[in-house]
Amino acid sequence: QQLSDAKIRIAAKTNCSKFIAYFQSYTNTYAPVAYLCSIYEEALQSPEIVALSIGTRSDCLGEDVLLLLSELQEKYPHKQIWIELGLQTMHNDTLQKMNTHTTVEQFDSAIDALTRIHIPVIAHVILGFPNETKEMMLQTISHVSRLPVSGIKLQLLHVLKNTELGNRYLEKPFPVMELMPYCDLVIDCLELLPPDLVVHRLTGDGPRNLLLAPLWSTDKKRVLNTIHHRLKERDTWQGRLFIS
């Protein structure tokens, strides 16, 4: 039903007739394999669906899930199956402070496993963790640039209500990224990435009713326009500083 509703909503805004089924929220491989198979196949069997994008964690890709993904890829050769894998940062101390309970080593291992079964991976990276410097964030981007991933999503850190990070912010506000430094950081990231790597996202807009900071991020069009403007001003491009 969610899929049908989404197709109707999108078709009303555009002339699209083909869609990507995006299992985004939470961890979409954390369930019994039989159940995962049923919901994935329900999407793949729809003639309008051309790809399946599954968001998950590096510690939720057991052998049974990998086998399922491999089997579905063989069963539906004309449709694409992607995994969106959360790295967030390569710095384990940050991951520990953010309570992700994952490590960069787990992420790299998951990349290896997915590469072996020819499943494309989109790496998800968060920019703006409170304890991270610009150099640390660019180290994460350089790390991703050396991995066999097919795409990347760059996500600005959002501080949201009713979260541990949000509670910390309300008790003792910490610095969050401002618009111009963020846009320039995104461009620095693009320069380090392979020129042929697909960039699926340059920012994000958190739910307005929950967002504590940074409030400028709600104007996504302004953020994207600023990035494009700064690219021209700096006369630079994706891959300019990439070293293979």
Per-region residue spans from a language model:
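Conserved non-cysteine loop/helix-boundary elements of the Radical SAM core domain that shape
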Residues: 25-38, 51-117, 127-147, 165-180
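Structural recognition of alpha->loop->beta junctions
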Residues: 40-49, 139-153, 224-238
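Active-site phosphate/pyrophosphate- and oxyanion-stabilizing loops and adjacent acidic/basic residues
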Residues: 41, 67, 187
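Residues that line or immediately flank small-molecule/substrate-binding pockets and catalytic motifs
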Residues: 56, 156, 206
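Auxiliary Fe-S-binding modules of radical SAM enzymes
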Residues: 151, 159-244
